[in-house]
Each structure stands twice: as C-alpha cells, then as structure tokens.
Amino acid sequence: KWRPIERLGVSLVLREELFGKEWTPIIPALFVDGVISERGNIVAKASVSRNFRFPTLNDLYFLPGGNPDLRKESGWTYDAGLSFAVGREGVYRLEGSATWFDSHISDWILWLPTAKGFFSPRNIKDVHAYGIELKADLSVALARDWQLDLDGNFSWTPSINEGEPMSPADKSVGKQLPYVPELSATVNG
C-alpha cells in the first residue's frame, strides 16, 4: 500500500487467472482509504474494480441442468463507504461500516427453473446490481473469562435485469432478478 501522506493509502492490483488453458483478461482494481478522524477511527474507503468470472463446473456440467454453452461474466464494480471503531480496552469494542456499491455485469449467470422440473443456468445479458451494506460488531467483556460477541449486517441489493427479453413471454427486463434477494439481514451472537 502506497501512502503519499500519513492519512491516505492507495493500492493498485493487477490480476490475471488461468482457468484450464484459458487466461482471464487483466483484472485491475484500485483501492483508496483515508483516515478522517483518529478519534473513533473513522475511515473513508473507495474502490473500482473489473470483474470476471468463468462458469463453475456445476454451472457447466451439473446433471441434470448444467449448461456447457454459458459465457463468462464480466463487468465493473464501484464502491465507497465509511467505517468506525470505538471502545475501551478490556471493556467493550464497537465497530461499524456503511458501504455503497454499484456493479454493471454482462452475461450474469443465473440458475432458473425449467419446464422439466429442474434448474439450469443461463446468461442474463446485462445486470445492474447496486445498493448499500451496513455492518456492526459489538464485543462486551461480561466477566474475567466471559465475553459477549454480537455481529449483524443488513443489505439492500437491487439486481436489475437491464438486458433483452430471453423470449417473447419474458417480462423480467427492468425487474429484480429472481432468486436474488433484494433485502437481507443477519445477526450472530
């Protein structure tokens, strides 16, 4: 990580992967983070990255339903967010983050039901997935050897089919992808 000044970090990653005998295109990613306030450890982060994904062996060959004609997914993702961390050593620690993201993916692989009663993957020409993710983690010391840990997250993730209809009866263009939840939340303790 390059730090042009003490509170700012910049990272550039260039990645290429081999899948069988085929190489991915170069997959760049740029990450920037900056400390806004040392009190509360408030940090702003942003990134831009290229996405590329080969179909999995299940996508291609699962029986029944695999689709050996699938194309590779590719696209770009942008995100930005804030994080914080506060606490008192040996007493408690609270961490949280809020992140906005925006992805434009071509040939998104989605498993859909068939008329034969099983699911099969298909490529969705253009998908726009965007939203926010909120995370929080709390640790509280209850006694000398006891600690309570709670963490949770909430995601709002519209994933919209912006491609072309796959058939004359396809009414999914402009709508949320099926089997991809728009809202999700978890709490663990």
Region annotations inferred by a language model:
Residues 14-20, 48-54, 61-63, 86, ...:
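Transmembrane beta-strands of outer-membrane beta-barrel pores
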Residues 22-26, 92-93, 146-148:
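Short glycine/proline-enriched turns and hinge-like loops at secondary-structure junctions
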